[in-house]
Amino acid sequence: MTFDFSKVSTPKGKPNDLDWQNPVSFFYKLSHPEIKDLFPVQRDILKNWFDEYKKGANDKMVSLNTGGGKTLIGLMIAESMRRDTSGKVVYVCPNTFLGKQTIDEAKKYGIKTASYLRLNGERPTWVNEPDFLQNNAVCVTTYHAILNPRSIFKNMEIRGVIFDDAHLSLDLLDRNFSLEVKDDAIIKAVSEIFKSSPHIKERIASIQEGDPIPLVMIPPIEWHKQTASIKDILNANEEIKNGLSWMNIKEKLDRTFCFISANKLEIGMLYPDIKNHYVFHESVHRVYLSATLPNLDDITRVFGVAPSRIEIDNPDYRPQRLFVFTKKLQFDDSEKIIRENLKDISQKTFVLTPSNEALTPYKSLGALIPTNSDDVPTKIDSFKKATEGILALANRYDGIDMPGGTCHSLLIDGLPYTGTLKTRFFSEYFHNHRNSFLRSIIASKLIQAFGRTIRANNDYSVIFILGSKLNSWVINMDNKKFFKSDLYEDIEIGIGISETVSSLDELKSLTKEILGQTDAWKVFFEEKKNGLKPVEVLSREEEQKNISLAKIEREINDLFMAANYRECLELILKNQSDLASYSQPIMGLYLSIAAICCLETNDVRVGELSARAYGINPIFGAPVISDKKARSLQAQRIIDFGKALPSFDWSVSGTTFDENLKRLGDILGFNSRRPEKEGDGTLDVCWEDEENN
């Protein structure tokens, strides 16, 4: 039998079509019978991005209203990068659920994808892996699959990354570089080490007694001194020892921060140590997608890059949102009454709560409530097909869409639970830090939630706001900078209307007006929108100032993580005026880091800097008492040099010798580091002068 070579396909090269890489052009050549055209705003964004991309611009942030077709834009950009580079491009989602939705969207648009998702079981599995390996398809995956230290992608030549829902990634990145421990014995053992610490000993005692309220940050200098003992405790636990989070932080444990409550211990970095991560190499093109307006300075601190925005005004985006604030309603027990009469107020309502416990009131109403995560899609599908009823979900603020008249009534019951212990602690103690991560994350979740029942330019929805904390958060004027102007205008209108509602019957009547789309409602809403004064948001000048400071904070973090203590110290001191004017509590934190740098470099300023941190807030720990007298830097270096000479003994281990050689470089005034220890693998020890020679 002769083998038939004619059936072997010929390898495909790049087509000669000049528009083959242009997303606006090739969109019309894809097979998507259900999708007739791009929205004008989508076309403008894709054109803007492609023009910038061809000029070599990187790190672009694309912001688009919920329901505005963000996923299509992301997929088109990913496909454009794949075609242009003939390389591997990954589309990164917060979780598997959203990954599946992205794949379904890609099929509708005629875009071929591969995926690496946890579809069944505990481990992710491949679908269409050969297509991705041969650079013939974009791969849809999750943040965890990309960021974990054993990532299957880290040895691949990744050319492009789409970070979808970038507003959620702030929290996701933080968690990947944090160790969370709920083992009572470990919490007890670690807290025992610090139980005599003057400022926190009472709260440590309360934590050890099981009090759920106290939350403690171990003073950074005290934590730094005790990390060898901490490492022994954690390494004794096999689950922790073999965990991916521990792999991310164990070699830099002395540069982490620890937070303890009665039921949780959390160890993490100030900001994720991703400077040398493979997806942040210069050769990788990155795009960040968001349905909110995240602070770019937050993105800069967490990602270590400063994206520039691609934001196109959409004049056709005119949804009708009626916010009902129970805090403003003029009748008693309004929240209880709304919960008990929800079916009478609105025939069909989608309910979102922060926890499973908060779902309890809706069980008696016969609400569809999933029994587990696998049951979520089934319950959603049943609700979409129904003409009445309630769907109640816990902590599902994004990815659940109610398009095409599926549901026009949304109830959000309670402020979203979010953030790590670190974020919670910073929010409580650094409350005047103007761009608190917690506020930014909460805003992102709420904006996502508000968009669940608004899926088109001219859609409409009533949105009930329940819970004292949630009402206060949304009404608070200080949080308006997190909202786009059109959303904040609707919130202002809702506050005014809610103040006029004095009974359940009036609330029913009001809800009937918007859900029935009466002429009276439409005229009223349009007049109110047109009568509002323009909302002041963060100016570009102020945003750029915040970004500049965020870059400095990120550089401090990177130097600290690299154990480049001397340069880190000098950078903090050089910028202390700007840091202090921005936030005194944050300045206290950086003074604590500066004091640690002094400890590591035998700098006599450790007492002064730790005392200044303590003066800002005792949470940073008692001042370090130094028996050294202040000397000039030159005199200190001469003394340190004399002490260092006996360390150079060829009989010591290679690791010890390298560390001694690094310290000698510090003494002589060089920027000294150990590339091999940092994962570089090129040099054992490197001394650099100010010109990096």
Describe every region a protein language model picked out.
Residues 27, 44, 50, 61-65, ...:
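Conserved coupling segment at the C-terminus of the helicase ATP-binding
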Residues 383-472:
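Conserved RecA-like P-loop NTPase helicase motor core
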Residues 363, 370, 636-676:
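Acidic-basic catalytic patches of nuclease active cores, encompassing PD-(D/E)XK
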Residues 4-63:
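Conserved pre-motif I regulatory segment
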Residues 601-653:
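Interdomain/boundary linker segments immediately adjacent to catalytic/signaling cores
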